[in-house]
Structure formats: C-alpha cells, structure tokens
Amino acid sequence: MGSGKERDTFVYLAKLSEQAERYEEMVESMKSVAKLNVDLTVEERNLLSVGYKNVIGSRRASWRIFSSIEQKEAVKGNDVNVKRIKEYMEKVELELSNICIDIMSVLDEHLIPSASEGESTVFFNKMKGDYYRYLAEFKSGNERKEAADQSLKAYEIATTAAEAKLPPTHPIRLGLALNFSVFYYEIMNAPERACHLAKQAFDEAISELDTLNEESYKDSTLIMQLLRDNLTLWTSDISEEGGDDAHKTNGSAKPGAGGDDAE
C-alpha cells in the first residue's frame, strides 16, 4: 500500500488536470490511487468518475453524430459516404472499447475488492453497469449480448446492495435507479420495465423526502427530476407505440435517445 503523501499527490494532480480539462491525465492520476488498493473517499470516487465520464463522453457524442449522419446518407442512397462513415465509426468504437476495458480492469482488480462499505459497493458496481451499457450501445450480435448481460448483472448487484444499505433518497441509489432504467429502455428495449423501475424509485424517494439532509437535497432532487422527465418521455412513447414490442429495433440500441442518465 502506498503512503498517504503519495495518495495526496495523485489526488491533487487529478484536481489540477480537471481544472485544465485534461481528462486523460485526470484518469491516469486516479487510476494510480485505485491501484493503492484502498477504499476511495467520496471526493476520490467523484474525481475518478468525472475523469472517465469526460474521456468516454466525447467519444459517445461523436459516435452518435456519426450514426445519425450515416442513417441520413443511407436514406439518400449515398453508399460511398456510408462506407466512409462506417470506417470512421470503427475508429471511435475502438477508442470506446479500450476505455471501457480499462475501467473494467480497474474496477474488478482494485476498486470493487477494496470497497469496504455499502456506498462504495453500490457506486462501483453501478459504474461497472454503466460502462458495460456504453459498450452495448454500439456493439452488435454476441458482443452486444455479452455486454448487456454483464451490465444487467452489475446493476443487479448494485441494486441489492443499495436496497440493503442506502435510503431511497440517497443520490447514489437514485442515480443507480435512473441509469438502470435507461438500460432497460435503451439496451433491453423494455420501456414498461424501465418505467416501473423509475416510478418505483421516484415514489419511494418522495415518501421519505422530509428525511433528506441539506447536503444531499440538491443532488437527490435533481436526479428525481431526471427520473420524472424520463417517465414523462417514456410513458408518452408507450402510449404512442403500443408497448414493448414496438420498441424493438433489430437488437440495436439508440444511444442517448432513451432519456437522461446520471453522472
């Protein structure tokens, strides 16, 4: 195990990198903390999460843009341009895959085994579910199924721990419910299951809203608003489309189209 001074240095460098928007370096600093095999503090967890979220977020946004343009070119019959876009998308997909593989190894080898409390266990398994979900957004065939299965498994482990250890109003438990419901909507093409999960989380939190401390109030109510926004979007889709089957799109996801998720 590394010294406290070494750990403090890595955390400080991660904060500097964040200020300068150098997110790849932010991630490297926080990976160094993770490799000390310690249970991360709330601040350290958030630094790790923000770093990876920004590193992968720009690529996910690029992939969505290319996917949208590809569909438009295909409709126009511009096969040459479709081929060019597909080649570019493959480059982005490789970058996305490498980022996801990287965080999975850090989670499986260091962060999840070192998690000593319920909050950390929920946080890191939720994170694992998120990054397998990001893989499932662009993978196809057996690779997509495997990513979806692993995402589901991680979200289920996180949910079991959250229900046992965290109150319904806890921002991490709410963020998990938000992202798990997005997984059901976007990846599993199951809007009714997504709505049930989101509504249950929202209703349970509402019933205990008066127990929220001032520190968590802003975070929790923001996620509750996202849950409600997604519910509004999804229930209108269900009534328009006529249920789950209408949302099945040849086993491929429509990333970002299914609602908001948490950081």
UniProtKB/Swiss-Prot annotation:
SUPFAM superfamilies: 14-3-3 protein. It is found in: Nucleus; Cytoplasm. SMART domains: 14_3_3 (SM00101). The keyword Nucleus applies. The modification Phosphoserine is found at residues 67, 239. Transmembrane segments: none annotated. Residues 239-263 are annotated as: Disordered. InterPro entries: 14-3-3, 14-3-3_CS, 14-3-3_dom_sf, 14-3-3_domain. Is associated with a DNA binding complex that binds to the G box, a well-characterized cis-acting DNA regulatory element found in plant genes. Interacts with DREB1A and DREB1B in the nucleus. This is 14-3-3-like protein GF14 mu. It comes from Arabidopsis thaliana.
